[in-house]
């Protein structure tokens, strides 16, 4: 089994580190456009192997895609963060070129790879990866919902005083602080609805804090988060390489599901060796469906920017 992570920044390196520690593949390639960065981080990770007890071979590469040949799974984290004064259109314009180029290079050497997209704006970059490559839709997966759902479980655990591991909670819709939809109605604590233990005000606060979770971290640390995004990407890789048939919320192509077509949005999916294998419709109520439709409209407007490039 071979996995490639494109982009050796904080998110990519963290994702690669998680993959290596869990021994999810025999060979892990970390690739970046900046000279020496991927090689250096790969060596640094390899030098923890004796301490942590893993046996994954980690190879760093400066933009040499031949080293990624034969990858079973590729995680794309490359792209620029949104800078002060940068418009949404400018960010999409820059990162669309990066993601499209990465996909082209990856498929030259790994035509059968499953691609996980973490680059932002994630819903639009996932849609671009799908439409530009022409790959079967099950082989293109956006990470956003997996991260947002983990943040949702964290917020719930803080109010309930329990372990996040004892909670089941999902976020659907877009990966953005105005487009995500935390489904607190469906959240459970060891099978019991969390709404039994939380006041209406607490529920509203948890949903609000989840939606601005990424922005809160950016304000605190001065840059985008990396531990949870990297771990979310690695968890998806694990579900694929171990054929776990595991339920995630991920950004995938919709063809009528949840009332939407020609768009990639976060919904419940089963992930296994074939990528995403099935969409599960948990049944949104009228209020949730209206929010989902609004989220789709916002993401679709971002996707429209791709037509101008």
Predicted feature residues:
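Conserved N-terminal Rossmann-fold NAD(P) cofactor-binding segment
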Residues: 33-71, 300-307
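Rossmann-like NAD(P)-binding element
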Residues: 51-113
């Amino acid at each position: 089994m071979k996995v490639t992570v494109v982009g050796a920044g904080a998110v990519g390196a963290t994702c690669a580190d998680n993959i290596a520690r869990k021994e999810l593949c025999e060979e892990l390639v970390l690739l970046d456009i900046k000279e020496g960065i991927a090689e250096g981080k790969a060596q640094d990770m390899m030098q923890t192997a004796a301490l942590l007890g893993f046996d994954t071979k980690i190879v760093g590469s400066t933009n040499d895609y031949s080293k990624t040949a034969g990858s079973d799974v590729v995680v794309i984290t490359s792209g620029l963060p949104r800078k002060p004064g940068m418009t949404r259109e400018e960010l999409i314009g820059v990162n669309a070129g990066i993601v499209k180029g990465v996909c082209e290079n990856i498929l030259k050497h790994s035509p059968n790879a499953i691609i996980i997209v973490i680059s932002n704006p994630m819903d639009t970059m996932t849609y671009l990866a799908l439409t530009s490559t022409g790959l079967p839709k099950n082989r293109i997966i956006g990470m956003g919902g997996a991260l947002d759902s983990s943040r949702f479980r964290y917020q719930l655990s803080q109010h309930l005083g329990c372990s996040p591991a004892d909670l089941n909670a999902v976020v659907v819709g877009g990966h953005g602080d105005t487009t995500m939809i935390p489904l607190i109605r469906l959240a459970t604590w060891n099978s019991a609805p969390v709404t039994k233990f939380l006041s209406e005000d607490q529920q509203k606060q948890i949903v609000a804090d989840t939606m601005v979770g990424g922005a809160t971290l950016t304000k605190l640390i001065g840059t985008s988060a990396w531990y949870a995004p990297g771990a979310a990407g690695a968890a998806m890789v694990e579900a694929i390489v171990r054929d776990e048939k595991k339920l995630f919320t991920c950004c995938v192509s919709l063809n009528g599901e949840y009332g939407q077509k020609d768009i990639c949005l976060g919904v419940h999916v089963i992930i296994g060796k074939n990528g995403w294998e099935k969409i599960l419709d948990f049944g949104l109520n009228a209020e949730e469906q209206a929010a989902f439709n609004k989220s789709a409209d916002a993401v679709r407007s971002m996707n429209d920017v791709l037509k101008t490039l």
